[in-house]
Amino acid sequence: MTHEFTENYDVIVIGAGHAGVEASLATSRMGCKTLLATINLDMLAFMPCNPSIGGSAKGIVVREIDALGGEMGKNIDKTYIQMKMLNTGKGPAVRALRAQADKSLYAREMKHTVEKQANLTLRQTMIDDILVEDGRVVGVLTATGQKFAAKAVVVTTGTALRGEIILGELKYSSGPNNSLASVTLADNLKKLGLEIGRFKTGTPPRVKASSINYDQTEIQPGDDKPNHFSFMSKDADYLKDQIPCWLTYTNQTSHDIINQNLYRAPMFSGIVKGVGPRYCPSIEDKIVRFADKERHQLFLEPEGRDTEEVYVQGLSTSLPEDVQKDLIHSIKGLEKAEMMRTGYAIEYDIVLPHQLRATLETKLISGLFTAGQTNGTSGYEEAAGQGLIAGINAALKVQGKPELILKRSDAYIGVMIDDLVTKGTLEPYRLLTSRAEYRLILRHDNADMRLTEIGRDIGLVDDERWKAFEIKKNQFDNELKRLNSIKLKPVKATNDRVQELGFKPLTDAMTAKEFMRRPEIDYATAVSFVGPAAEDLDAKIIELLETEIKYEGYIRKALDQVAKMKRMEEKRIPANIDWDAIDSIATEARQKFKKINPETIGQASRISGVNPADISILMIYLEGNGKAHRKY
């Protein structure tokens, strides 16, 4: 079929949420003429649920996005109202940053960034169809009948695909925050042959700040110590005038109200059909599943400096409006609170992610990429990370360059994508530190060391950032080398000082680096014995040095595991492999292989239901028959 296109682009991104913004900024910065199409310009990078960025594992993803040259970290550093490092009492592998956002300012700042970006056109329009010829994308069709040509299309529609809002017995077609739903595009994706799933998520009510009795709650302040998501942000710019959050709890009265109205709860009455998030359940679900718990935490989170809206984190619900009011008034500090918005549930279509490659391109259609909640994830950070990778790979495909695949040992983003494309997901997927087997090398403090060079190679890291990174890396390397070369000897003067500080004396000579491996010896103590570095070191470099030195043995073990797995990751499986021709593999393994069509032995080994014997048989088969190369 011959199409008459009115406009021509290299890449078209459908949807301007957190995934779409990162995808379109990446493609345009890599030199591709890009269209970012959105149903509503006023909802670009909008936060329809929680007014925060980061958190456990998620905060590390934001640092990874920043290291690769993405935008989320820089944007939240300009628009936060509170910053807090989580898990400071635990090991470095699980520490992560979390920021309360001024949600309207966050969206405004991101919109400004998109509007001034070269090669990027921003358009309010609804895309109804993705145009495909001979198995590859050629463009899109708008609801107004316009046809735009494209060499690649990235679908980042969030919860808008056949979205339906549910509040008590009320159910109506809608995207998030009462925006338009994308119904025709949902039909089109199904017609193209993609398998579609149905998920559900929800949001809590918002209450008026001036109607809260804060004396009945516990204050939750931000950190005084400067921290940032972007490696380019300066400590001097750290916000001193932060806004606190507040902690309160449900109680037995709250639980009674919910239990007495379960028959009116869409979750239990059969109105809700979609699968909800395991790690962010509704309050009614929590009360039923954890009936033995006397109370549940609720955090009162301001939505910005210039609004009275307060987000009641932990109270996600789709109960009827009158029940929500009673529930709020049963909670300490909220007895007289004014509900400004009701909570609601939203059901939406997703593209089942086992149909994707690790580049986030669909296996079925060349040039069609999907990212974010469209792939079954939850969270702004997970969406942004996928959007960045999908955008990068869309640009690389258009330019005829090698694709970018982040491995599980490279980044949490790599862990997430591998989980999605290898295991799929039966519920909204959330990143957790426990999902990463190499989490000690995927830390908050070393994301730039892991990923900045990759960002530079693909063209997203500019000269200013690259120069700053090179200075930091050289300072780190030089100081590590110095500490490993200077020796402390067990002489009287040294041991007298060691004992004065309350530490065990030295029995043998050791390097300053070995001295720092002692749990009680920090960098400042070590250099008090051996002298300071040739130049003043930033606190972040010192933190990195301490972690790398104190956990060196564990880090080395993790890197050894990575090296072993690398051999399996490099063993490719031909795209044209005949799974039925492999004798002796288990029926379940054969079925899973056919469904997922893994690209490497490493990926095949991580598929649920596949055992080591199946992998051994597969490797023997490939050594004898696997001569073909995978092509897309």
Curated annotation (Swiss-Prot):
InterPro entries: FAD/NAD-bd_sf, GIDA_C_N, MnmG, MnmG-rel, MnmG-rel_CS, MnmG_C, MnmG_C_subdom, MnmG_C_subdom_sf
Organism: Streptococcus pyogenes serotype M4 (strain MGAS10750)
Hydrolase keyword on record: no
Cell compartments where the protein resides: Cytoplasm
The protein's role, per its UniProt record: NAD-binding protein involved in the addition of a carboxymethylaminomethyl (cmnm) group at the wobble position (U34) of certain tRNAs, forming tRNA-cmnm(5)s(2)U34.
Family matches, as Gene3D superfamilies: FAD/NAD(P)-binding domain (3.50.50.60), GidA associated domain, C-terminal subdomain (1.10.150.570), tRNA uridine 5-carboxymethylaminomethyl modification enzyme MnmG/GidA (1.10.10.1800)
Listed GO biological process terms: tRNA methylation; tRNA wobble uridine modification
Protein name, entry field: tRNA uridine 5-carboxymethylaminomethyl modification enzyme MnmG
Gene (name only): mnmG
Gene Ontology terms for molecular function: flavin adenine dinucleotide binding
Residues annotated to bind NAD(+): 276-290
Domain of life where this protein originates: Bacteria
Main location class: cytoplasm
The keyword Cytoplasm is annotated on this UniProt entry: yes
UniProt keyword list: Cytoplasm, FAD, Flavoprotein, NAD, tRNA processing
Pfam families cross-referenced by the UniProt entry: GIDA (PF01134), GIDA_C_1st (PF21680), SAM_GIDA_C (PF13932)
Entry's Gene Ontology cellular component terms: cytosol
HAMAP family: MnmG_GidA
Family membership: Belongs to the MnmG family.
Assembly mode: Homodimer. Heterotetramer of two MnmE and two MnmG subunits.
Cofactor (UniProt): FAD
Annotated FAD binding sites: 15-20, 127, 182, 373
